[in-house]
From Swiss-Prot:
This is Sorting nexin-12. One of its GO terms (molecular function) is phosphatidylinositol-3-phosphate binding. Residues 1-20 are annotated as: Disordered. GO terms for biological process: endocytic recycling; late endosome to Golgi transport; negative regulation of early endosome to late endosome transport; negative regulation of gene expression; negative regulation of protein catabolic process; negative regulation of protein processing; negative regulation of protein transport; protein transport. Pfam families: PX (PF00787). A 1,2-diacyl-sn-glycero-3-phospho-(1D-myo-inositol-3-phosphate) binds at residues 71, 73, 96, 119. The modification N-acetylserine is found at residue 2. The lineage of its organism: Eukaryota, Metazoa, Chordata, Craniata, Vertebrata. Disulfide bonds: none annotated. It comes from the Eukaryota. The PX domain mediates interaction with membranes enriched in phosphatidylinositol 3-phosphate.
Length: 162
């Protein structure tokens, strides 16, 4: 081994790792889970909501933990706001499942458990991809989506300042 390779290796091992370093909280983290789907309403006014729980230590977020209820149309709103105002490429949402909404189906359509679970997983992937993007983390609409009980659809778009 060359002298520079040995010196580089020595430099990596300069500080021994203790249990706090190994098992303590990561320096920066952002965890978002979507869970507990609930179908509410009847007939044409029936829809499914999901709990969106966020935990973070990123200083850009005013709350370190939040839990809000969102429906699919709220995710559509967020996607449209980000596409309109930000410079990031917004991933697609899970599909609308138009065929599942046709009347006189033999199953529950969009209210079938397997479909709700599939959509929940897709929404969780969607929100984690967006929230993990450094530019999206500055968008006011993302903060409102994750941390406000109600979404103010008349808000003024902009960046969040630390």
């Amino acid at each position: 081994m060359s002298d520079t390779a040995v010196a580089d290796t020595r430099r990596l091992n300069s500080k021994p790792q203790d249990l706090t370093d190994a098992y303590g909280p990561p320096s920066n983290f952002l965890e978002i889970d979507i869970f507990n789907p609930q179908t509410v309403g009847v007939g044409r006014a029936r829809f499914t909501t999901y709990e969106v729980r966020m935990r973070t230590n990123l200083p850009i977020f005013k709350l370190k933990e939040s839990c809000v209820r969102r429906r699919y149309s709220d995710f559509e709103w967020l996607k449209n706001e980000l596409e309109r105002d930000s410079k990031i490429v917004v991933p697609p949402l899970p599909g609308k499942a138009l065929k599942r909404q046709l009347p006189f189906r033999g199953d529950e359509g969009i209210f079938e458990e397997s479909f709700i679970e599939e959509r929940r997983q897709g929404l969780e992937q969607f929100i984690n991809k967006i929230a993990g993007h450094p530019l999206a983390q500055n968008e006011r609409c993302l903060h409102m989506f994750l941390q406000e009980e109600a979404i103010d659809r008349n808000y003024v778009p902009g960046k969040v300042r630390q």
